[in-house]
Amino acid sequence: MKVELKILNKELIKELPGYATEGSAAIDLRACISESIYLKSGECKLIATGIAINIANPNYAAMILPRSGLGHKKGLVLGNGTGLIDSDYQGELMVSCFNRSQETIEIEPLMRFAQLVIVPVVQANFEIVEDFSQQSVRATGGFGHTGV
């Protein structure tokens, strides 16, 4: 699948986004900043990536996810949980970063701080109904209904 990637900040030429291994599901996003940003405990900031993408296919979207090591070891996660990039969005990718740790976290220029994965999307045709055509076994059970 072809996705156009536009480099908005020439500093990224030094460290182009790409897949780390043949089996990588996502590309690492780099902090496209001129100087380090310090996130205090409980603080949330938008970090520029210096790139824009053009998926141009409504059957796909992109998701921005935290890097597992940074989330687990440092407490750096996404402020919005997951970033969803629609297929028709063409602006710069910005990442909401949240520090859930007790320590200040430094985000350095060109640091790999998040990741981007392309995922398939199905757009549903919703039909307004009074009752569902079939009752599932689960029905309305939720929030621990099948066990905790």
Curated annotation (Swiss-Prot):
<keyword id="KW-0460">Magnesium</keyword>
<keyword id="KW-0378">Hydrolase</keyword>
<comment type="pathway">
    <text>Pyrimidine metabolism; dUMP biosynthesis; dUMP from dCTP (dUTP route): step 2/2.</text>
</comment>
<feature type="binding site">
    <location>
        <begin position="84"/>
        <end position="86"/>
    </location>
    <ligand>
        <name>substrate</name>
    </ligand>
</feature>
<dbReference type="GO" id="GO:0000287">
    <property type="term" value="F:magnesium ion binding"/>
</dbReference>
<comment type="function">
    <text>This enzyme is involved in nucleotide metabolism: it produces dUMP, the immediate precursor of thymidine nucleotides and it decreases the intracellular concentration of dUTP so that uracil cannot be incorporated into DNA.</text>
</comment>
<dbReference type="Pfam" id="PF00692">
    <property type="entry name" value="dUTPase"/>
</dbReference>
<comment type="similarity">
    <text>Belongs to the dUTPase family.</text>
</comment>
<dbReference type="InterPro" id="IPR036157">
    <property type="entry name" value="dUTPase-like_sf"/>
</dbReference>
<keyword id="KW-0479">Metal-binding</keyword>
<protein>
    <recommendedName>
        <fullName>Deoxyuridine 5'-triphosphate nucleotidohydrolase</fullName>
        <ecNumber>3.6.1.23</ecNumber>
    </recommendedName>
</protein>
<dbReference type="GO" id="GO:0046081">
    <property type="term" value="P:dUTP catabolic process"/>
</dbReference>
<feature type="binding site">
    <location>
        <begin position="67"/>
        <end position="69"/>
    </location>
    <ligand>
        <name>substrate</name>
    </ligand>
</feature>
<dbReference type="GO" id="GO:0006226">
    <property type="term" value="P:dUMP biosynthetic process"/>
</dbReference>
<dbReference type="InterPro" id="IPR029054">
    <property type="entry name" value="dUTPase-like"/>
</dbReference>
<dbReference type="InterPro" id="IPR033704">
    <property type="entry name" value="dUTPase_trimeric"/>
</dbReference>
<dbReference type="InterPro" id="IPR008181">
    <property type="entry name" value="dUTPase"/>
</dbReference>
<feature type="binding site">
    <location>
        <position position="94"/>
    </location>
    <ligand>
        <name>substrate</name>
    </ligand>
</feature>
<keyword id="KW-0546">Nucleotide metabolism</keyword>
<feature type="binding site">
    <location>
        <position position="80"/>
    </location>
    <ligand>
        <name>substrate</name>
    </ligand>
</feature>
<dbReference type="GO" id="GO:0004170">
    <property type="term" value="F:dUTP diphosphatase activity"/>
</dbReference>
